[in-house]
């Protein structure tokens, strides 16, 4: 008989569950009624809407819901140039940059100068942007100056007399300063290319040893390890600062191995407060002088041989 009895606590818990279920049903019914309240009222009058809202209509698409403006007068012809919907122009551009980065890494590993590689890469990027994103000029605008130039060229008359070579004409005297400018420009370009090659060699060797740690004397009469990564600097800034180290440009011009520990110490003393706190500056200065002297001696021996 005791097995068939139901405990009063089970009855009370069952009643509580029933009450909670009823409350849940009421809450769901209320939410449904609130969400459909706009369907129970009067329909909206389009004329009562703001002017901007009256110009728009809703269309049901199979994949998404689009809002289309009915006012076609504000349509701009410039929008025809851009890609259609669903085509992201950044996807092919990102693929182009990935391929370009792979080529840059491959060329740096082969020993090419950094600035020479970057000049070629920048031209590739400019060409891609101009051909993909920029709008080409129309032929009408190009043909106009061509026609005016052809009409403005005077034809030689029958009374034309040749000018002796020892007496230059006015046009030659006016354009006499053009040739020296071209010579100066070529000389400046040649000097710039030489500087770019030297800086590119420095950047190449520094980049190869960016994470390599070098030993420096510390203030506690010991040593500590330091590398280029701890400077938190760009490679271009490191190269510009390292060009102030005496003899670095000559060693890079000869294609020799650079005193990277000396360069790291010089740049760190100039740019890193943490390095100045850790290092014994006097010992670091002597260490840098010894490195420069040893590397310059090797270069001189190679030149003599």
UniProtKB/Swiss-Prot annotation:
The UniProt GO MF terms for this protein read:
RNA-directed RNA polymerase activity
Identify the domain of life.
Viruses
Protein's UniProt keywords contain Phosphoprotein: yes
Q: Where is the composition biased (Polar residues)?
A: 139-151
Locate the motif Nuclear export signal.
49-58
What biological process terms from GO does the record include? symbiont-mediated suppression of host innate immune response; symbiont-mediated suppression of host JAK-STAT cascade via inhibition of STAT1 activity; symbiont-mediated suppression of host JAK-STAT cascade via inhibition of STAT2 activity; symbiont-mediated suppression of host type I interferon-mediated signaling pathway; viral transcription
- Protein name, per record: Phosphoprotein
What species is given as this protein's source?
A: Lagos bat virus
């Amino acid at each position: 008989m005791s097995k068939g009895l139901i405990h009063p606590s089970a009855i009370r818990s069952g009643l509580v569950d029933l009450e909670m279920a009823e409350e849940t049903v009421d809450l769901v019914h209320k939410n449904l009624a609130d969400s459909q309240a706009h369907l129970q009222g009067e329909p909206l009058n389009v004329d009562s809407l703001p002017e901007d809202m009256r110009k728009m209509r809703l269309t049901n698409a199979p994949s998404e819901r689009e809002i289309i403006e009915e006012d076609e007068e504000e349509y701009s012809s410039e929008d025809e140039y851009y890609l259609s919907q669903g085509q992201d122009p950044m996807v092919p551009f990102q693929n182009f940059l990935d391929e370009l980065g792979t080529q840059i890494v491959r060329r740096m590993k082969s020993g090419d100068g950094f600035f020479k590689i970057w000049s070629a890469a920048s031209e590739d990027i400019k060409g891609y942007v101009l051909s993909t994103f920029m709008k080409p000029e129309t032929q009408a605008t190009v043909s106009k100056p061509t026609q005016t130039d052809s009409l403005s060229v005077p034809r030689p008359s029958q009374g034309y007399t040749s000018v002796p070579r020892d007496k230059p004409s006015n046009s030659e005297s006016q354009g006499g300063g053009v040739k020296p400018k071209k010579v100066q420009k070529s000389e400046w370009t040649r000097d710039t290319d030489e500087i770019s090659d030297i800086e590119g060699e420095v950047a190449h060797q520094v980049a190869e040893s960016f994470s390599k740690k070098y030993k420096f004397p510390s203030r506690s009469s010991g040593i500590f390890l330091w590398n280029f990564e701890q400077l938190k600097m760009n490679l271009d800034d490191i190269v510009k600062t390292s060009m102030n180290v005496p003899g670095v440009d000559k060693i890079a011009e000869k294609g020799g191995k650079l005193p990277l520990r000396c360069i790291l110490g010089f740049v760190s003393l100039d740019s890193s407060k943490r390095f100045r706190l850790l290092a014994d500056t006097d010992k670091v200065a002597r260490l840098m002088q010894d490195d420069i002297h040893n590397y310059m001696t090797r270069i001189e021996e190679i030149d003599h041989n």
